[in-house]
């Protein structure tokens, strides 16, 4: 391993479920640093014991982050090497540590991030949703009004949207997505990533809700919600004749069947017609 610099903070990702996912470099750093700043001592000890690593752990969580950051800066100024870890995944993503890193930059203390696990990116990679542009929104608010306000503000967000959600609120959150964004918007639920009961399921929001309700075990564990971005209908208009045809058919047939027949009669793109009419029917 390369020589450590003097006074360095290492950002060390840890596995999000499968302990085999930890990197060799992460293990080397955890062995060789002077201090490991952990979000949860007991949780991190389980990881260290699994890999036969013994080191000095101190607690840094959201409750003591400000005070502990000051203490750690003093240690770093003395030339100590410190590893920052969270309960799982890459630190700072919904975890404490940002204050410490900011202070490191202020005092010109080197910060070295290690690449590694992140539930949001892991889920996104397997979602099948176009992901060249995406926004990460963290955990959905626990209060319904705040959650609905946020979802409504993202109704026409063209980028793929990523949320974390708990098993306790997943059903209510999917209902709010249907209400505030679109019942027909494609979403993916990625559950228990890298763990034994990992599952990834994608469908329209309304179908996702039905799928979850079919089996209570489908909404157990930690969830990542991925929402397809809003698709704008650019310069797409329909003639009165086409709309009249659709309106007549809609009185007798389902939305899908009415769209299909109308598209065949007028030789137009059924997908564009479908997107157009569902917006009108909302």
Swiss-Prot record:
What protein name applies here? Answer: Ribosomal RNA small subunit methyltransferase I
What Gene Ontology terms describe what this protein does at the molecular function level?
A: rRNA (cytosine-2'-O-)-methyltransferase activity
Q: Which domain of life is it from?
A: Bacteria
Q: Keyword rRNA processing: yes or no?
A: yes
Question: Which is one Gene Ontology cellular component term of this protein?
Answer: cytoplasm
Chief subcellular location equals: cytoplasm
* Reactions catalysed according to its record: cytidine(1402) in 16S rRNA + S-adenosyl-L-methionine = 2'-O-methylcytidine(1402) in 16S rRNA + S-adenosyl-L-homocysteine + H(+)
Q: What does this protein do?
A: Catalyzes the 2'-O-methylation of the ribose of cytidine 1402 (C1402) in 16S rRNA.
Q: The organism's lineage?
A: Bacteria, Pseudomonadati, Pseudomonadota, Gammaproteobacteria, Enterobacterales
Q: Where does the record place it?
A: Cytoplasm
Q: Which family does it belong to?
A: Belongs to the methyltransferase superfamily. RsmI family.
Q: Which CDD domains match?
A: RsmI
The record's section on InterPro entries has: 4pyrrol_Mease, 4pyrrol_Methylase_sf, 4pyrrole_Mease_sub1, 4pyrrole_Mease_sub2, rRNA_ssu_MeTfrase_I, SAM_MeTrfase_RsmI_CS
Top-level EC class, please?
transferase
SUPFAM superfamilies tied to this protein: Tetrapyrrole methylase
Entry EC number(s): 2.1.1.198
Q: Which organism is it from?
A: Buchnera aphidicola subsp. Acyrthosiphon pisum (strain APS) (Acyrthosiphon pisum symbiotic bacterium)
HAMAP family per UniProt: 16SrRNA_methyltr_I (MF_01877)
Q: Which UniProt keywords apply?
A: Cytoplasm, Methyltransferase, rRNA processing, S-adenosyl-L-methionine, Transferase
């Amino acid at each position: 391993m390369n020589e450590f610099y003097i006074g360095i903070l290492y950002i060390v990702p840890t596995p999000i479920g499968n302990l085999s996912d930890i990197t060799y470099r992460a293990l080397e750093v955890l062995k060789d640093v002077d201090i490991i700043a952990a979000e949860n001592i007991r949780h991190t000890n389980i990881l260290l014991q699994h890999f036969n690593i013994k080191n000095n752990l101190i607690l840094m969580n959201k409750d003591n982050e400000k005070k502990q950051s000051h203490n750690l800066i003093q240690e770093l100024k003395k030339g100590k090497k410190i590893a920052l870890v969270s309960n799982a995944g890459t630190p700072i993503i919904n975890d404490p540590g940002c204050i410490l890193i900011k202070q490191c930059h202020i005092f010109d203390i080197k910060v070295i991030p290690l690449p590694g696990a992140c539930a949001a990116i892991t889920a996104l990679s397997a979602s099948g949703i176009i992901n060249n542009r995406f926004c990460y929104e963290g955990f959905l608010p626990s209060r319904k009004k705040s959650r609905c306000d946020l979802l409504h503000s993202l109704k026409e967000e063209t980028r793929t949207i990523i949320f974390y959600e708990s098993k306790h609120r997943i059903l209510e959150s999917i209902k709010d997505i249907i209400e505030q964004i679109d019942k027909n918007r494609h979403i993916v639920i990625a559950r228990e990533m890298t763990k034994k009961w990992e599952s990834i399921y994608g469908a329209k929001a309304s179908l996702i809700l039905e799928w979850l309700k079919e089996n209570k075990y489908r909404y157990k564990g930690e969830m990542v919600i991925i929402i397809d971005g809003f698709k704008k209908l650019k310069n797409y208009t329909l003639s009165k004749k086409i709309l009249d045809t659709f309106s007549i058919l809609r009185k007798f047939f389902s939305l899908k069947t009415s769209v299909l027949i109308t598209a065949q009669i007028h030789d137009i793109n059924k997908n564009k017609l479908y997107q157009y009419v569902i917006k009108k029917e909302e």
